[in-house]
């Protein structure tokens, strides 16, 4: 018998303000048709004035706890994946911990940009397998609208705000691929490519938050090359292949990347959970939100084999394979 980290609850939160492409047409030199054609995005959500990443994260976390029929006091740890924290420190995770009324365990943030949730899930899995924790809240939360340069029309139209969360619980398994829970993970980084996707501000450099800068064509090239490969590697680690996959839940960067990656994996789009049209690119929040939406839609069901994959600034990229 072996231990597995099993998803027992999911939840997400979207700010109430919906920003359709037509609204962005009034802010920058763009069109609804251009945005849809290039990205597949139709609308996104922006946090309200005064609404911060920790607010979004807390709401998503509470939804996941409710789904798992747990309270905050049942949880041993909180891990938040974010690149847009409320403050330089303390961690958003500690703010979430306090707001949930959790007075035990530990909390910390993970920063791997759009790949952050995959890294956080792998981290939480290791914590559970090592006996450090039995129940962990893993959250992806972002307010990317706060780091948009509204004169950069090719980039500012792509991003949105939101948060998603899962509850991971230790459960007994057989060690086989039929077990529920995380079966494998593959994580990668290559800092040589850090200049194609970054924020031009920071505490020890400019003492400003800065704005997101992206070389879209280069990011697209790396995404197509690396996402299918990391998913294939993670599947192989579990002794599985693409033919075993029920659902791919990718980072919702844009529809062209999602479609090209699925094609490269040999998986039809009818087996891919897609939320990018409604959410835009929400960085580390995109996969947990897509998991939550996939469950709510009735797509992801118990026993399904799910593959998540993401790439973000760093560059950092990875995949987690799990049985729902």
Curated annotation (Swiss-Prot):
<dbReference type="InterPro" id="IPR004655">
    <property type="entry name" value="FabH"/>
</dbReference>
<protein>
    <recommendedName>
        <fullName>Beta-ketoacyl-[acyl-carrier-protein] synthase III</fullName>
        <ecNumber>2.3.1.180</ecNumber>
    </recommendedName>
</protein>
<keyword id="KW-0275">Fatty acid biosynthesis</keyword>
<keyword id="KW-0276">Fatty acid metabolism</keyword>
<keyword id="KW-0444">Lipid biosynthesis</keyword>
<dbReference type="InterPro" id="IPR013747">
    <property type="entry name" value="ACP_syn_III_C"/>
</dbReference>
<dbReference type="Pfam" id="PF08545">
    <property type="entry name" value="ACP_syn_III"/>
</dbReference>
<dbReference type="Pfam" id="PF08541">
    <property type="entry name" value="ACP_syn_III_C"/>
</dbReference>
<keyword id="KW-0443">Lipid metabolism</keyword>
<feature type="active site">
    <location>
        <position position="114"/>
    </location>
</feature>
<feature type="active site">
    <location>
        <position position="251"/>
    </location>
</feature>
<dbReference type="GO" id="GO:0044550">
    <property type="term" value="P:secondary metabolite biosynthetic process"/>
</dbReference>
<dbReference type="GO" id="GO:0005737">
    <property type="term" value="C:cytoplasm"/>
</dbReference>
<comment type="function">
    <text>Catalyzes the condensation reaction of fatty acid synthesis by the addition to an acyl acceptor of two carbons from malonyl-ACP. Catalyzes the first condensation reaction which initiates fatty acid synthesis and may therefore play a role in governing the total rate of fatty acid production. Possesses both acetoacetyl-ACP synthase and acetyl transacylase activities. Its substrate specificity determines the biosynthesis of branched-chain and/or straight-chain of fatty acids.</text>
</comment>
<keyword id="KW-0808">Transferase</keyword>
<dbReference type="GO" id="GO:0006633">
    <property type="term" value="P:fatty acid biosynthetic process"/>
</dbReference>
<keyword id="KW-0511">Multifunctional enzyme</keyword>
<keyword id="KW-0963">Cytoplasm</keyword>
<dbReference type="GO" id="GO:0004315">
    <property type="term" value="F:3-oxoacyl-[acyl-carrier-protein] synthase activity"/>
</dbReference>
<dbReference type="InterPro" id="IPR016039">
    <property type="entry name" value="Thiolase-like"/>
</dbReference>
<comment type="similarity">
    <text>Belongs to the thiolase-like superfamily. FabH family.</text>
</comment>
<feature type="active site">
    <location>
        <position position="281"/>
    </location>
</feature>
<feature type="region of interest" description="ACP-binding">
    <location>
        <begin position="252"/>
        <end position="256"/>
    </location>
</feature>
<keyword id="KW-0012">Acyltransferase</keyword>
<dbReference type="InterPro" id="IPR013751">
    <property type="entry name" value="ACP_syn_III_N"/>
</dbReference>
<comment type="subunit">
    <text>Homodimer.</text>
</comment>
<comment type="pathway">
    <text>Lipid metabolism; fatty acid biosynthesis.</text>
</comment>
<dbReference type="GO" id="GO:0033818">
    <property type="term" value="F:beta-ketoacyl-acyl-carrier-protein synthase III activity"/>
</dbReference>
